[in-house]
Protein backbone atom coordinates (compact mmCIF):
# COMPACT_ATOMS: atom_id res chain seq x y z
CA UNK A 1 0.00 0.00 0.00
CA UNK A 2 1.65 3.31 -1.04
CA UNK A 3 2.60 5.71 1.70
CA UNK A 4 0.40 8.76 1.93
CA UNK A 5 1.91 12.21 2.39
CA UNK A 6 0.05 15.10 3.92
CA UNK A 7 0.47 18.83 4.22
CA UNK A 8 1.56 20.19 7.55
CA UNK A 9 -1.74 21.96 8.04
CA UNK A 10 -3.38 18.56 8.51
CA UNK A 11 -1.32 17.82 11.61
CA UNK A 12 -2.81 18.80 14.95
CA UNK A 13 -0.64 20.58 17.52
CA UNK A 14 1.14 18.48 20.14
CA UNK A 15 0.58 15.19 18.25
CA UNK A 16 1.56 13.64 14.96
CA UNK A 17 -1.20 11.29 13.92
CA UNK A 18 0.54 9.83 10.89
CA UNK A 19 3.25 7.22 11.21
CA UNK A 20 6.53 7.96 9.44
CA UNK A 21 5.28 11.19 8.08
CA UNK A 22 8.72 12.75 8.17
CA UNK A 23 7.68 15.56 10.47
CA UNK A 24 9.54 15.13 13.75
CA UNK A 25 9.03 18.52 15.25
CA UNK A 26 6.70 21.34 14.28
CA UNK A 27 6.61 25.00 15.14
CA UNK A 28 3.94 25.77 17.70
CA UNK A 29 3.78 29.37 16.54
CA UNK A 30 3.16 28.14 13.02
CA UNK A 31 0.32 25.86 14.06
CA UNK A 32 -1.53 27.50 16.91
CA UNK A 33 0.34 30.58 17.90
CA UNK A 34 1.00 29.13 21.36
CA UNK A 35 4.20 27.75 22.89
CA UNK A 36 3.57 24.14 23.87
CA UNK A 37 6.98 22.80 22.92
CA UNK A 38 6.18 19.13 22.37
CA UNK A 39 7.61 16.55 19.98
CA UNK A 40 5.45 14.73 17.43
CA UNK A 41 4.61 11.15 18.27
CA UNK A 42 3.90 8.26 15.98
CA UNK A 43 0.36 7.04 16.26
CA UNK A 44 -1.22 3.65 15.98
CA UNK A 45 -4.40 2.42 14.38
CA UNK A 46 -6.15 2.87 17.70
CA UNK A 47 -6.20 6.64 17.19
CA UNK A 48 -8.98 6.29 14.66
CA UNK A 49 -12.14 4.23 15.03
CA UNK A 50 -14.87 3.55 12.50
CA UNK A 51 -17.17 5.97 14.30
CA UNK A 52 -14.66 8.73 13.53
CA UNK A 53 -15.10 8.25 9.81
CA UNK A 54 -18.69 6.99 9.69
CA UNK A 55 -21.15 9.07 7.72
CA UNK A 56 -24.57 9.40 9.30
CA UNK A 57 -27.77 10.56 7.62
CA UNK A 58 -31.10 11.33 9.17
CA UNK A 59 -34.23 9.70 7.71
CA UNK A 60 -35.16 12.92 5.91
CA UNK A 61 -31.69 13.28 4.40
CA UNK A 62 -31.62 9.66 3.24
CA UNK A 63 -35.01 10.03 1.57
CA UNK A 64 -33.71 12.97 -0.47
CA UNK A 65 -30.85 11.06 -2.11
CA UNK A 66 -31.39 9.45 -5.48
CA UNK A 67 -30.09 5.98 -6.36
CA UNK A 68 -26.75 7.21 -7.72
CA UNK A 69 -26.05 9.24 -4.59
CA UNK A 70 -26.98 6.31 -2.34
CA UNK A 71 -24.62 4.05 -4.28
CA UNK A 72 -21.88 6.65 -3.83
CA UNK A 73 -22.56 6.72 -0.10
CA UNK A 74 -22.37 2.94 0.18
CA UNK A 75 -19.10 2.78 -1.75
CA UNK A 76 -17.56 5.46 0.46
CA UNK A 77 -18.62 3.72 3.68
CA UNK A 78 -17.18 0.39 2.56
CA UNK A 79 -13.98 2.11 1.38
CA UNK A 80 -13.61 3.81 4.77
CA UNK A 81 -13.96 0.48 6.52
CA UNK A 82 -11.43 -1.20 4.23
CA UNK A 83 -8.96 1.64 4.82
CA UNK A 84 -9.43 1.27 8.57
CA UNK A 85 -8.82 -2.49 8.41
CA UNK A 86 -5.68 -1.96 6.33
CA UNK A 87 -4.32 0.37 9.01
CA UNK A 88 -5.53 -1.27 12.22
CA UNK A 89 -5.52 -4.91 11.09
CA UNK A 90 -8.09 -7.62 11.53
CA UNK A 91 -8.70 -6.66 15.15
CA UNK A 92 -11.31 -4.14 13.99
CA UNK A 93 -14.85 -5.38 14.62
CA UNK A 94 -17.07 -5.11 11.56
CA UNK A 95 -19.79 -2.49 12.24
CA UNK A 96 -23.42 -3.45 11.79
CA UNK A 97 -23.96 -0.85 9.07
CA UNK A 98 -21.20 -2.41 6.93
CA UNK A 99 -22.88 -5.80 7.26
CA UNK A 100 -26.16 -4.27 6.08
CA UNK A 101 -24.51 -2.60 3.10
CA UNK A 102 -22.70 -5.77 2.05
CA UNK A 103 -26.01 -7.64 2.18
CA UNK A 104 -27.59 -5.05 -0.10
CA UNK A 105 -29.87 -3.67 2.61
CA UNK A 106 -30.71 -0.06 3.34
CA UNK A 107 -28.92 1.35 6.38
CA UNK A 108 -30.91 2.66 9.33
CA UNK A 109 -29.05 5.89 9.85
CA UNK A 110 -29.66 8.11 12.83
CA UNK A 111 -28.79 11.74 13.13
CA UNK A 112 -25.37 12.39 14.55
CA UNK A 113 -24.43 15.63 16.19
CA UNK A 114 -20.98 16.83 17.15
CA UNK A 115 -20.68 17.76 20.78
CA UNK A 116 -19.63 21.22 21.72
CA UNK A 117 -15.88 21.37 21.61
CA UNK A 118 -12.78 23.17 20.53
CA UNK A 119 -11.79 23.68 16.95
CA UNK A 120 -8.08 23.73 16.08
CA UNK A 121 -6.63 26.95 14.77
CA UNK A 122 -5.06 25.09 11.89
CA UNK A 123 -8.46 25.11 10.23
CA UNK A 124 -8.25 28.87 9.94
CA UNK A 125 -4.79 28.43 8.44
CA UNK A 126 -6.25 26.08 5.88
CA UNK A 127 -8.58 28.86 4.80
CA UNK A 128 -5.56 30.86 3.61
CA UNK A 129 -4.51 28.01 1.33
CA UNK A 130 -7.42 28.30 -1.04
CA UNK A 131 -7.46 26.54 -4.35
CA UNK A 132 -8.72 28.33 -7.44
CA UNK A 133 -12.28 27.40 -8.23
CA UNK A 134 -14.89 28.06 -10.90
CA UNK A 135 -18.44 29.22 -10.42
CA UNK A 136 -20.58 26.29 -9.43
CA UNK A 137 -23.84 25.51 -11.19
CA UNK A 138 -25.25 24.59 -7.79
CA UNK A 139 -25.84 27.04 -5.03
CA UNK A 140 -23.55 26.07 -2.18
CA UNK A 141 -26.63 25.83 0.00
CA UNK A 142 -28.15 23.22 -2.29
CA UNK A 143 -29.41 20.29 -0.20
CA UNK A 144 -28.19 17.65 -2.60
CA UNK A 145 -24.77 19.30 -2.84
CA UNK A 146 -24.51 19.33 0.94
CA UNK A 147 -25.31 15.65 1.23
CA UNK A 148 -22.77 14.60 -1.40
CA UNK A 149 -20.18 16.95 0.09
CA UNK A 150 -20.77 15.30 3.42
CA UNK A 151 -20.10 11.81 2.04
CA UNK A 152 -17.00 12.64 0.03
CA UNK A 153 -15.57 15.00 2.64
CA UNK A 154 -15.43 12.40 5.39
CA UNK A 155 -13.98 9.80 3.02
CA UNK A 156 -11.34 12.33 1.97
CA UNK A 157 -10.41 13.13 5.55
CA UNK A 158 -9.97 9.50 6.49
CA UNK A 159 -8.14 8.53 3.30
CA UNK A 160 -5.68 11.34 3.91
CA UNK A 161 -4.54 10.47 7.39
CA UNK A 162 -6.76 8.26 9.54
CA UNK A 163 -6.95 11.42 11.61
CA UNK A 164 -10.57 12.48 11.44
CA UNK A 165 -10.22 14.59 14.56
CA UNK A 166 -13.09 15.12 16.97
CA UNK A 167 -12.73 18.64 18.22
CA UNK A 168 -13.39 17.83 21.86
CA UNK A 169 -11.52 14.56 22.25
CA UNK A 170 -8.56 14.59 19.85
CA UNK A 171 -7.02 17.96 20.64
CA UNK A 172 -5.27 19.13 23.76
CA UNK A 173 -4.91 22.74 24.75
CA UNK A 174 -7.34 25.62 24.51
CA UNK A 175 -8.43 27.31 21.32
CA UNK A 176 -10.83 30.08 20.68
CA UNK A 177 -13.60 28.78 18.40
CA UNK A 178 -16.52 26.57 19.25
CA UNK A 179 -19.29 24.98 17.24
CA UNK A 180 -22.61 24.14 18.80
CA UNK A 181 -24.07 20.89 17.48
CA UNK A 182 -23.15 21.29 13.84
CA UNK A 183 -24.90 18.90 11.52
CA UNK A 184 -25.77 18.88 7.79
CA UNK A 185 -28.76 20.72 6.45
CA UNK A 186 -32.20 19.19 6.97
CA UNK A 187 -33.53 18.70 3.49
CA UNK A 188 -36.53 20.84 2.77
CA UNK A 189 -38.26 21.05 -0.54
CA UNK A 190 -35.89 21.91 -3.33
CA UNK A 191 -34.62 19.51 -5.92
CA UNK A 192 -31.58 20.97 -7.62
CA UNK A 193 -31.82 21.21 -11.40
CA UNK A 194 -29.28 19.24 -13.36
CA UNK A 195 -27.94 20.40 -16.72
CA UNK A 196 -25.01 19.77 -19.08
CA UNK A 197 -22.63 21.65 -16.84
CA UNK A 198 -19.92 20.97 -14.36
CA UNK A 199 -20.92 20.01 -10.87
CA UNK A 200 -18.37 20.95 -8.32
CA UNK A 201 -18.36 19.06 -5.09
CA UNK A 202 -16.50 21.45 -2.81
CA UNK A 203 -14.62 19.52 -0.21
CA UNK A 204 -12.78 20.34 2.99
CA UNK A 205 -12.39 24.02 3.60
CA UNK A 206 -14.04 24.30 6.97
CA UNK A 207 -14.07 27.86 8.18
CA UNK A 208 -15.61 28.89 11.49
CA UNK A 209 -15.45 32.22 13.22
CA UNK A 210 -15.01 32.76 16.92
CA UNK A 211 -17.93 31.79 19.18
CA UNK A 212 -20.22 31.14 16.25
CA UNK A 213 -22.97 28.58 16.09
CA UNK A 214 -24.97 27.16 13.23
CA UNK A 215 -28.38 27.93 14.63
CA UNK A 216 -30.35 27.38 11.44
CA UNK A 217 -30.22 23.72 10.43
CA UNK A 218 -31.95 24.45 7.14
CA UNK A 219 -28.88 26.35 5.92
CA UNK A 220 -25.35 25.06 5.51
CA UNK A 221 -23.97 28.57 5.70
CA UNK A 222 -25.17 31.26 8.09
CA UNK A 223 -24.14 34.86 8.57
CA UNK A 224 -20.47 34.99 9.50
CA UNK A 225 -20.08 31.25 9.06
CA UNK A 226 -19.35 29.02 6.13
CA UNK A 227 -18.84 25.38 5.53
CA UNK A 228 -17.16 25.01 2.21
CA UNK A 229 -15.01 22.38 0.62
CA UNK A 230 -12.68 23.39 -2.17
CA UNK A 231 -10.47 20.42 -2.99
CA UNK A 232 -12.50 18.14 -5.21
CA UNK A 233 -14.06 19.16 -8.51
CA UNK A 234 -15.94 16.46 -10.35
CA UNK A 235 -17.49 16.50 -13.81
CA UNK A 236 -20.70 14.52 -13.95
CA UNK A 237 -23.04 13.76 -16.87
CA UNK A 238 -26.72 14.58 -17.00
CA UNK A 239 -28.99 13.39 -14.25
CA UNK A 240 -30.52 10.78 -16.54
CA UNK A 241 -27.06 9.25 -17.03
CA UNK A 242 -26.35 9.23 -13.31
CA UNK A 243 -29.12 6.67 -12.92
CA UNK A 244 -26.98 4.19 -14.89
CA UNK A 245 -23.47 5.26 -13.88
CA UNK A 246 -22.43 6.18 -10.38
CA UNK A 247 -19.29 7.88 -11.68
CA UNK A 248 -17.53 7.97 -15.01
CA UNK A 249 -15.88 4.57 -15.09
CA UNK A 250 -12.32 5.53 -15.90
CA UNK A 251 -12.04 8.63 -13.72
CA UNK A 252 -11.12 8.89 -10.10
CA UNK A 253 -13.31 10.53 -7.55
CA UNK A 254 -10.24 11.87 -5.77
CA UNK A 255 -7.25 12.77 -7.94
CA UNK A 256 -4.08 10.95 -6.91
CA UNK A 257 -0.93 13.04 -6.85
CA UNK A 258 1.53 10.23 -7.53
CA UNK A 259 4.14 12.48 -9.08
CA UNK A 260 4.65 14.41 -5.88
CA UNK A 261 3.64 17.69 -7.46
CA UNK A 262 3.22 20.67 -5.18
CA UNK A 263 -0.02 20.76 -3.24
CA UNK A 264 -1.10 24.02 -1.71
CA UNK A 265 2.05 25.65 -0.31
CA UNK A 266 4.65 23.22 -1.51
CA UNK A 267 3.35 20.11 0.29
CA UNK A 268 2.52 16.90 -1.56
CA UNK A 269 -0.70 14.98 -1.14
CA UNK A 270 -1.40 11.50 -2.48
CA UNK A 271 -5.00 10.32 -2.35
CA UNK A 272 -6.32 6.79 -2.87
CA UNK A 273 -8.61 6.08 -5.76
CA UNK A 274 -12.23 5.43 -4.78
CA UNK A 275 -15.50 4.73 -6.59
CA UNK A 276 -13.62 3.33 -9.60
CA UNK A 277 -15.53 0.06 -9.53
CA UNK A 278 -16.28 -1.77 -12.76
CA UNK A 279 -19.83 -2.96 -13.33
CA UNK A 280 -19.14 -6.66 -13.73
CA UNK A 281 -22.37 -8.01 -12.22
CA UNK A 282 -25.06 -8.15 -14.89
CA UNK A 283 -28.73 -8.94 -14.43
CA UNK A 284 -29.71 -11.91 -16.59
CA UNK A 285 -33.28 -10.61 -16.95
CA UNK A 286 -32.86 -7.02 -18.12
CA UNK A 287 -29.10 -6.74 -18.76
CA UNK A 288 -28.51 -3.95 -16.26
CA UNK A 289 -24.99 -4.00 -14.77
CA UNK A 290 -23.84 -3.23 -11.24
CA UNK A 291 -20.54 -2.78 -9.46
CA UNK A 292 -21.36 -5.01 -6.50
CA UNK A 293 -23.03 -8.37 -6.05
CA UNK A 294 -25.09 -7.06 -3.15
CA UNK A 295 -26.62 -4.34 -5.32
CA UNK A 296 -27.44 -6.90 -8.00
CA UNK A 297 -29.14 -9.07 -5.37
CA UNK A 298 -31.24 -6.12 -4.28
CA UNK A 299 -32.11 -5.29 -7.90
CA UNK A 300 -33.11 -8.92 -8.52
CA UNK A 301 -36.06 -8.47 -6.16
CA UNK A 302 -37.74 -6.36 -8.85
CA UNK A 303 -37.96 -9.41 -11.10
CA UNK A 304 -38.64 -12.03 -8.43
CA UNK A 305 -41.14 -9.91 -6.54
CA UNK A 306 -39.48 -10.78 -3.23
CA UNK A 307 -40.65 -8.52 -0.41
CA UNK A 308 -39.06 -9.53 2.91
CA UNK A 309 -40.11 -6.43 4.85
CA UNK A 310 -43.69 -6.59 6.18
CA UNK A 311 -45.79 -3.91 7.84
CA UNK A 312 -47.27 -5.13 11.13
CA UNK A 313 -50.20 -2.75 10.82
CA UNK A 314 -51.68 -3.78 7.48
CA UNK A 315 -49.53 -6.71 6.38
CA UNK A 316 -48.21 -4.93 3.29
CA UNK A 317 -44.76 -6.10 2.22
CA UNK A 318 -41.83 -4.24 0.70
CA UNK A 319 -38.60 -5.17 -1.03
CA UNK A 320 -36.50 -2.62 0.88
CA UNK A 321 -36.45 -1.55 4.50
CA UNK A 322 -36.46 2.13 3.55
CA UNK A 323 -39.74 1.63 1.69
CA UNK A 324 -41.27 0.11 4.81
CA UNK A 325 -40.09 3.08 6.86
CA UNK A 326 -41.74 5.53 4.48
CA UNK A 327 -44.92 3.44 4.47
CA UNK A 328 -45.21 3.47 8.27
CA UNK A 329 -45.67 7.23 8.18
CA UNK A 330 -49.00 6.71 6.37
CA UNK A 331 -50.34 4.85 9.43
CA UNK A 332 -49.16 7.46 11.90
CA UNK A 333 -50.85 10.22 9.92
CA UNK A 334 -47.83 12.45 10.47
CA UNK A 335 -47.27 15.05 7.76
CA UNK A 336 -44.29 17.15 8.81
CA UNK A 337 -43.56 18.69 5.40
CA UNK A 338 -45.74 21.71 4.67
CA UNK A 339 -45.94 23.75 1.50
CA UNK A 340 -45.34 27.43 2.25
CA UNK A 341 -47.43 28.45 -0.77
CA UNK A 342 -50.76 26.75 -0.06
CA UNK A 343 -50.23 25.16 3.36
CA UNK A 344 -50.78 21.59 2.15
CA UNK A 345 -48.85 19.05 4.22
CA UNK A 346 -47.13 15.84 3.13
CA UNK A 347 -45.66 12.83 4.89
CA UNK A 348 -42.55 12.67 2.67
CA UNK A 349 -40.22 15.39 1.49
CA UNK A 350 -40.25 13.93 -2.05
CA UNK A 351 -44.03 14.40 -2.19
CA UNK A 352 -43.61 18.03 -1.15
CA UNK A 353 -41.00 18.54 -3.87
CA UNK A 354 -43.29 17.09 -6.52
CA UNK A 355 -46.18 19.22 -5.27
CA UNK A 356 -44.24 22.48 -5.38
CA UNK A 357 -43.67 22.10 -9.10
CA UNK A 358 -47.41 22.77 -9.51
CA UNK A 359 -46.86 26.28 -8.12
CA UNK A 360 -43.74 27.13 -10.13
CA UNK A 361 -44.96 25.50 -13.34
CA UNK A 362 -41.37 24.76 -14.30
CA UNK A 363 -41.02 21.85 -16.73
CA UNK A 364 -37.46 21.81 -18.10
CA UNK A 365 -37.51 18.26 -19.51
CA UNK A 366 -39.14 18.06 -22.95
CA UNK A 367 -39.98 15.00 -25.03
CA UNK A 368 -38.38 15.19 -28.47
CA UNK A 369 -41.16 13.08 -30.00
CA UNK A 370 -44.30 14.94 -28.98
CA UNK A 371 -42.98 18.09 -27.29
CA UNK A 372 -44.58 17.33 -23.93
CA UNK A 373 -42.65 18.78 -20.98
CA UNK A 374 -42.08 17.41 -17.51
CA UNK A 375 -40.85 18.78 -14.21
CA UNK A 376 -38.67 15.74 -13.46
CA UNK A 377 -36.38 13.70 -15.67
CA UNK A 378 -37.78 10.47 -14.22
CA UNK A 379 -41.23 11.42 -15.51
CA UNK A 380 -39.75 12.04 -18.96
CA UNK A 381 -38.09 8.61 -18.96
CA UNK A 382 -41.38 6.95 -18.06
CA UNK A 383 -43.18 8.95 -20.74
CA UNK A 384 -40.72 7.87 -23.44
CA UNK A 385 -41.81 4.27 -22.94
CA UNK A 386 -45.21 5.24 -24.35
CA UNK A 387 -43.56 6.02 -27.70
CA UNK A 388 -41.32 2.94 -27.68
CA UNK A 389 -44.10 0.70 -26.31
CA UNK A 390 -41.49 -0.79 -24.00
CA UNK A 391 -43.13 -2.88 -21.29
CA UNK A 392 -40.50 -4.12 -18.86
CA UNK A 393 -42.77 -5.29 -16.06
CA UNK A 394 -44.73 -8.49 -16.64
CA UNK A 395 -47.24 -10.16 -14.37
CA UNK A 396 -46.17 -13.73 -13.62
CA UNK A 397 -49.73 -14.88 -13.08
CA UNK A 398 -51.49 -13.75 -16.26
CA UNK A 399 -48.56 -12.57 -18.38
CA UNK A 400 -49.83 -9.02 -18.84
CA UNK A 401 -47.01 -6.49 -19.27
CA UNK A 402 -46.84 -2.88 -18.14
CA UNK A 403 -44.77 0.18 -18.89
CA UNK A 404 -44.45 1.24 -15.26
CA UNK A 405 -43.62 -0.88 -12.24
CA UNK A 406 -46.31 0.90 -10.22
CA UNK A 407 -48.89 -0.27 -12.76
CA UNK A 408 -47.74 -3.86 -12.28
CA UNK A 409 -48.02 -3.57 -8.49
CA UNK A 410 -51.50 -2.11 -8.89
CA UNK A 411 -52.49 -4.90 -11.29
CA UNK A 412 -51.22 -7.69 -9.01
CA UNK A 413 -53.73 -6.65 -6.37
CA UNK A 414 -56.46 -7.91 -8.71
CA UNK A 415 -55.11 -11.44 -8.31
CA UNK A 416 -54.48 -11.18 -4.58
CA UNK A 417 -57.72 -9.33 -3.83
CA UNK A 418 -55.82 -6.99 -1.53
CA UNK A 419 -57.74 -3.83 -0.67
CA UNK A 420 -55.95 -2.07 2.19
CA UNK A 421 -57.57 1.35 1.73
CA UNK A 422 -61.04 1.57 3.30
CA UNK A 423 -63.54 4.42 3.17
CA UNK A 424 -64.51 5.57 6.67
CA UNK A 425 -67.90 6.76 5.46
CA UNK A 426 -69.31 3.63 3.83
CA UNK A 427 -66.67 0.98 4.54
CA UNK A 428 -65.88 0.31 0.89
CA UNK A 429 -62.31 -0.87 0.33
CA UNK A 430 -59.93 -0.12 -2.53
CA UNK A 431 -56.66 -1.53 -3.77
CA UNK A 432 -54.89 1.82 -4.08
CA UNK A 433 -55.08 5.16 -2.31
CA UNK A 434 -55.91 7.13 -5.47
CA UNK A 435 -59.13 5.15 -5.92
CA UNK A 436 -60.08 5.84 -2.32
CA UNK A 437 -59.43 9.56 -2.80
CA UNK A 438 -61.58 9.60 -5.93
CA UNK A 439 -64.34 7.65 -4.17
CA UNK A 440 -64.41 10.01 -1.18
CA UNK A 441 -65.44 12.83 -3.48
CA UNK A 442 -68.81 11.07 -3.81
CA UNK A 443 -69.43 11.74 -0.13
CA UNK A 444 -67.97 15.24 -0.08
CA UNK A 445 -69.44 16.12 -3.51
CA UNK A 446 -66.10 17.72 -4.30
CA UNK A 447 -65.79 18.48 -8.01
CA UNK A 448 -62.77 20.54 -8.92
CA UNK A 449 -62.30 19.89 -12.67
CA UNK A 450 -64.47 22.12 -14.86
CA UNK A 451 -65.15 21.84 -18.58
CA UNK A 452 -64.43 25.14 -20.32
CA UNK A 453 -67.09 24.39 -22.96
CA UNK A 454 -70.20 23.66 -20.91
CA UNK A 455 -68.88 24.53 -17.41
CA UNK A 456 -69.69 21.05 -16.14
CA UNK A 457 -67.48 19.97 -13.24
CA UNK A 458 -66.01 16.55 -12.52
CA UNK A 459 -64.39 14.90 -9.53
CA UNK A 460 -61.36 13.61 -11.45
CA UNK A 461 -59.27 14.79 -14.36
CA UNK A 462 -59.78 11.54 -16.29
CA UNK A 463 -63.55 12.07 -16.24
CA UNK A 464 -63.09 15.59 -17.58
CA UNK A 465 -60.85 14.41 -20.43
CA UNK A 466 -63.36 11.71 -21.31
CA UNK A 467 -66.22 14.23 -21.24
CA UNK A 468 -64.43 16.74 -23.47
CA UNK A 469 -64.43 14.23 -26.30
CA UNK A 470 -68.19 14.87 -26.56
CA UNK A 471 -67.50 18.45 -27.62
CA UNK A 472 -64.62 17.70 -29.97
CA UNK A 473 -66.11 14.48 -31.37
CA UNK A 474 -62.54 13.37 -31.99
CA UNK A 475 -62.22 9.57 -32.11
CA UNK A 476 -58.72 8.68 -33.31
CA UNK A 477 -58.82 5.01 -32.29
CA UNK A 478 -60.61 2.83 -34.84
CA UNK A 479 -61.49 -0.86 -34.66
CA UNK A 480 -60.10 -2.75 -37.67
CA UNK A 481 -62.91 -5.31 -37.46
CA UNK A 482 -66.03 -3.16 -37.55
CA UNK A 483 -64.54 0.32 -38.17
CA UNK A 484 -66.06 1.65 -34.97
CA UNK A 485 -64.09 4.58 -33.54
CA UNK A 486 -63.29 5.52 -29.97
CA UNK A 487 -61.84 8.54 -28.25
CA UNK A 488 -59.60 6.51 -25.93
CA UNK A 489 -57.23 3.61 -26.54
CA UNK A 490 -58.53 1.87 -23.43
CA UNK A 491 -62.08 1.96 -24.84
CA UNK A 492 -60.85 0.38 -28.06
CA UNK A 493 -59.07 -2.41 -26.18
CA UNK A 494 -62.21 -3.14 -24.21
CA UNK A 495 -64.27 -3.17 -27.42
CA UNK A 496 -61.93 -5.68 -29.10
CA UNK A 497 -62.86 -8.28 -26.50
CA UNK A 498 -66.35 -8.35 -27.97
CA UNK A 499 -64.95 -9.64 -31.26
CA UNK A 500 -62.74 -12.36 -29.80
CA UNK A 501 -65.40 -13.33 -27.25
CA UNK A 502 -62.88 -13.04 -24.44
CA UNK A 503 -64.60 -13.05 -21.06
CA UNK A 504 -61.97 -13.58 -18.36
CA UNK A 505 -64.06 -12.25 -15.47
CA UNK A 506 -66.52 -14.79 -14.07
CA UNK A 507 -69.09 -14.31 -11.32
CA UNK A 508 -68.41 -16.67 -8.42
CA UNK A 509 -72.13 -16.83 -7.54
CA UNK A 510 -73.92 -17.54 -10.82
CA UNK A 511 -71.01 -18.30 -13.14
CA UNK A 512 -71.79 -15.58 -15.67
CA UNK A 513 -68.69 -14.27 -17.43
CA UNK A 514 -67.86 -10.75 -18.54
CA UNK A 515 -65.35 -9.09 -20.81
CA UNK A 516 -64.53 -6.33 -18.36
CA UNK A 517 -63.86 -6.35 -14.67
CA UNK A 518 -66.04 -3.28 -14.17
CA UNK A 519 -68.99 -5.18 -15.68
CA UNK A 520 -68.43 -8.02 -13.22
CA UNK A 521 -68.38 -5.62 -10.27
CA UNK A 522 -71.57 -3.99 -11.46
CA UNK A 523 -73.21 -7.40 -11.98
CA UNK A 524 -72.18 -8.58 -8.54
CA UNK A 525 -74.32 -5.85 -6.99
CA UNK A 526 -77.40 -7.66 -8.32
CA UNK A 527 -76.64 -10.49 -5.89
CA UNK A 528 -75.65 -8.26 -2.98
CA UNK A 529 -78.32 -5.61 -3.58
CA UNK A 530 -75.73 -2.91 -3.01
CA UNK A 531 -76.63 0.54 -4.29
CA UNK A 532 -73.89 2.89 -3.13
CA UNK A 533 -74.76 5.87 -5.37
CA UNK A 534 -77.50 8.08 -3.93
CA UNK A 535 -79.19 11.10 -5.47
CA UNK A 536 -78.92 14.08 -3.12
CA UNK A 537 -82.13 15.57 -4.56
CA UNK A 538 -84.63 12.75 -4.06
CA UNK A 539 -82.66 10.09 -2.19
CA UNK A 540 -82.98 7.43 -4.89
CA UNK A 541 -80.07 4.98 -4.96
CA UNK A 542 -78.35 3.24 -7.85
CA UNK A 543 -75.93 0.37 -8.29
CA UNK A 544 -73.60 2.22 -10.66
CA UNK A 545 -72.53 5.82 -11.00
CA UNK A 546 -73.57 6.13 -14.66
CA UNK A 547 -77.21 5.45 -13.77
CA UNK A 548 -77.02 8.13 -11.09
CA UNK A 549 -75.57 10.59 -13.61
CA UNK A 550 -78.41 9.94 -16.07
CA UNK A 551 -80.99 10.21 -13.29
CA UNK A 552 -79.68 13.56 -12.09
CA UNK A 553 -80.45 15.03 -15.50
CA UNK A 554 -84.13 14.72 -14.60
CA UNK A 555 -83.57 17.28 -11.84
CA UNK A 556 -81.17 19.52 -13.75
CA UNK A 557 -82.96 19.32 -17.11
CA UNK A 558 -79.65 18.74 -18.85
CA UNK A 559 -79.85 17.22 -22.34
CA UNK A 560 -76.31 16.93 -23.69
CA UNK A 561 -77.15 14.73 -26.71
CA UNK A 562 -78.43 16.84 -29.60
CA UNK A 563 -79.67 15.73 -33.01
CA UNK A 564 -77.79 17.38 -35.87
CA UNK A 565 -80.79 17.08 -38.20
CA UNK A 566 -83.61 18.69 -36.23
CA UNK A 567 -81.85 20.05 -33.14
CA UNK A 568 -83.83 17.95 -30.69
CA UNK A 569 -81.91 17.19 -27.48
CA UNK A 570 -81.95 14.14 -25.24
CA UNK A 571 -80.66 13.23 -21.80
CA UNK A 572 -79.45 9.78 -22.89
CA UNK A 573 -77.26 8.80 -25.79
CA UNK A 574 -79.43 5.75 -26.48
CA UNK A 575 -82.48 7.99 -26.92
CA UNK A 576 -80.60 10.06 -29.47
CA UNK A 577 -79.59 6.92 -31.36
CA UNK A 578 -83.21 5.73 -31.46
CA UNK A 579 -84.37 9.17 -32.59
CA UNK A 580 -81.89 9.34 -35.47
CA UNK A 581 -83.53 6.27 -37.02
CA UNK A 582 -86.52 8.48 -37.80
CA UNK A 583 -84.38 10.59 -40.11
CA UNK A 584 -82.55 7.60 -41.56
CA UNK A 585 -85.77 5.65 -42.20
CA UNK A 586 -84.45 2.60 -40.37
CA UNK A 587 -87.02 0.07 -39.09
CA UNK A 588 -84.98 -2.72 -37.53
CA UNK A 589 -87.90 -4.58 -35.96
CA UNK A 590 -89.78 -5.34 -39.19
CA UNK A 591 -89.14 -9.09 -38.78
CA UNK A 592 -92.08 -10.68 -36.95
CA UNK A 593 -91.37 -13.16 -34.17
CA UNK A 594 -93.12 -16.49 -34.70
CA UNK A 595 -93.39 -17.40 -31.04
CA UNK A 596 -94.65 -14.02 -29.88
CA UNK A 597 -96.34 -12.12 -32.71
CA UNK A 598 -96.83 -8.40 -32.43
CA UNK A 599 -100.00 -7.22 -30.72
CA UNK A 600 -100.79 -5.19 -33.82
CA UNK A 601 -100.84 -8.36 -35.94
CA UNK A 602 -103.78 -9.66 -33.92
CA UNK A 603 -105.99 -7.07 -35.60
CA UNK A 604 -104.33 -6.25 -38.88
CA UNK A 605 -102.71 -8.30 -41.61
CA UNK A 606 -101.07 -5.46 -43.49
CA UNK A 607 -97.39 -5.47 -44.38
CA UNK A 608 -96.56 -2.37 -42.36
CA UNK A 609 -93.44 -2.55 -40.24
CA UNK A 610 -92.73 -0.94 -36.91
CA UNK A 611 -89.61 0.39 -35.26
CA UNK A 612 -90.37 -1.11 -31.83
CA UNK A 613 -91.82 -4.43 -30.81
CA UNK A 614 -94.55 -4.31 -28.16
CA UNK A 615 -95.29 -7.44 -26.16
From Swiss-Prot:
Q: Has keyword Zinc? A: yes
Q: Which PROSITE patterns match?
A: KRAB, ZINC_FINGER_C2H2_1, ZINC_FINGER_C2H2_2
Which sequence ranges does the entry mark as zinc finger (C2H2-type)?
Answer: 281-303, 309-331, 337-359, 365-387, 393-415, 421-443, 449-471, 477-499, 505-527, 533-555, 561-583
- List the Gene Ontology MF annotations in alphabetical order: DNA-binding transcription factor activity, RNA polymerase II-specific; RNA polymerase II cis-regulatory region sequence-specific DNA binding; zinc ion binding
The cellular component terms of Gene Ontology attached to this UniProt record, alphabetical and capped at eight, are: nucleus
Pfam families the UniProt entry points to:
KRAB, zf-C2H2, zf-C2H2_6
The organism's place on the tree of life at top rank: Eukaryota
| Keywords linked to the UniProt accession | DNA-binding, Isopeptide bond, Metal-binding, Nucleus, Repeat, Transcription, Transcription regulation, Ubl conjugation, Zinc, Zinc-finger
Residues forming the KRAB domain are: 48-120
Give its localization: Nucleus
Q: Where is this cross-link: Glycyl lysine isopeptide (Lys-Gly) (interchain with G-Cter in SUMO2)?
A: 153, 170
Q: Does the keyword RNA-binding apply?
A: no
What role is this protein assigned?
May be involved in transcriptional regulation.
Family that this chain belongs to:
Belongs to the krueppel C2H2-type zinc-finger protein family.
Q: Which PANTHER family match?
A: FINGER PUTATIVE TRANSCRIPTION FACTOR FAMILY-RELATED, GENE, 19965-RELATED
Q: What is this protein called?
A: Zinc finger protein 181
Gene behind the chain: ZNF181
